Regions:
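A glycine-anchored, Pro-Gly-centered beta-turn/N-cap motif
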Residues: 99-108
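Extended, polar beta-sheet/loop recognition surfaces of beta-rich domains
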Residues: 50-54, 112-127
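N-terminal edge beta-strand
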Residues: 28-47
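N-terminal signal peptide c-region/cleavage motif recognized by signal peptidases
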Residues: 24-26
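Short, flexible loop/turn segments at beta-strand junctions in immunoglobulin-like
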Residues: 95-97
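Bacterial N-terminal signal peptides that target proteins for export
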Residues: 2-14
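Short, surface-exposed alpha-helix to beta-strand junction/turn motifs within ectodomains of secreted
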Residues: 52, 57-79
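Aromatic sugar-binding surface patches on proteins
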Residues: 86-92
Length: 127
């Protein structure tokens, strides 16, 4: 290969790599749960009156949900899950007075960038 051909190939390779870097989209661009009340795996002495989840991105209200389930498999929340009108990164649901036991919080959210996150965590109310 001539010197001129090597230089042309190197320029082409550099241009291709630069284009790939500039056009790449972030792989981790999706809503991440940053905190919750109650916290995951918490053991509580007090009965919570709601579950609140905060994410690192704004959520699409029509496609975001959270529910709370007993260890017997019964949904126990009030069914009023909603994205906060004053904070589009917060999702909450009201709880009735719950008896002691283990509970599972299940959530599915769609961030405004179009990524769906489906996950869960547990908490326990002490006897």
């Amino acid at each position: 290969m001539t010197r001129r051909a090597c230089a042309a190939a190197a320029r082409h390779l550099i241009a291709s790599l630069a284009g790939a870097v500039l056009l790449a989209t972030p792989a981790g661009a999706h809503a991440v749960l940053v905190r919750s009340t109650p916290p995951g795996r918490a053991t509580l002495a007090e009965k919570p009156d709601r579950v609140q989840l905060w994410f690192n991105e704004r959520l699409e209200p029509a496609f975001s949900s959270v529910s709370v389930w007993s260890s017997a498999g019964t949904q126990v929340d009030a069914g009023d899950a909603r994205v906060g009108p004053e904070d589009a990164k917060r999702l909450s649901v009201t709880l009735p007075p719950l008896p002691p036991g283990a509970y599972s919080v299940r959530y599915r959210v769609l961030s405004v960038d179009g990524h769906v996150v489906d996950s869960s965590f547990t908490f326990t109310i002490r006897r």
